């Protein structure tokens, strides 16, 4: 059900966001406990502010309320926010822009005994990512097939 909601709402949300020259980073419809959440993550060069998030929220809420049939028949919370410092990497442009940055990559199955890699993204191809990471005190490099990746995002290095 949540994928159908996202497929229905994505073009509406994308039109509103792009009309303001913002980027729709991600859109998700998820259940947490007893509540449903429609979450949009938007951004622009230099960062997005709270007023811009509120403006997109108001416009999207108005459009969704006017849609027939209702794309989300149950009660839900609409949240519009910045992707934050740990921005998800989903589109090809996201990966290209992340080259040289510190990333967190989770895998479906272990590779070299690990399911999570955090390190500097050094190369991106249409099928792979290459990450330089620290294993205890040794620098290592791993190349990961994209099909193995469950999720990827920028990460904050401590």
From Swiss-Prot:
UniProt keyword annotation of Cytoplasm present: yes
Matching Pfam families: DUF150_C, RimP_N
CDD domains in the record: YlxS_C
UniProt keywords, alphabetically: Cytoplasm, Ribosome biogenesis
Subcellular location: Cytoplasm
GO biological process, one term: translation
Intrachain S-S bonds: none
Cellular component terms per the entry's GO annotation: cytosol
Matching HAMAP family: RimP
Family: Belongs to the RimP family.
General function of this protein: Required for maturation of 30S ribosomal subunits.
Protein name: Ribosome maturation factor RimP
Organism in which the protein naturally occurs: Lactiplantibacillus plantarum (strain ATCC BAA-793 / NCIMB 8826 / WCFS1)
Gene name of the encoded protein: rimP
């Amino acid at each position: 059900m949540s994928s159908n909601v996202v497929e229905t709402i994505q073009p509406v949300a994308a039109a509103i966001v792009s009309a303001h020259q913002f980027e729709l980073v991600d859109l998700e419809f998820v259940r947490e406990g007893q509540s449903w959440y429609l979450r949009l993550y938007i951004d622009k060069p230099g960062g997005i502010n709270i007023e811009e998030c509120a403006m997109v929220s108001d416009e999207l809420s108005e459009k969704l309320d006017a849609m027939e049939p209702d794309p989300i028949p149950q009660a839900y919370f609409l949240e519009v926010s910045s992707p934050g410092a740990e921005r998800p990497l989903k589109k090809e442009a996201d990966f290209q822009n992340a080259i040289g940055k510190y990333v967190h990559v989770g895998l479906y199955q272990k590779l070299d005994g690990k399911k999570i890699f955090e390190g500097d993204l050094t190369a991106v191809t249409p099928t792979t990512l290459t990450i330089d990471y620290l294993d205890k005190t040794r620098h290592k490099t791993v190349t990961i097939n994209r099909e193995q990746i469950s999720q990827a995002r920028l990460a904050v290095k401590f």
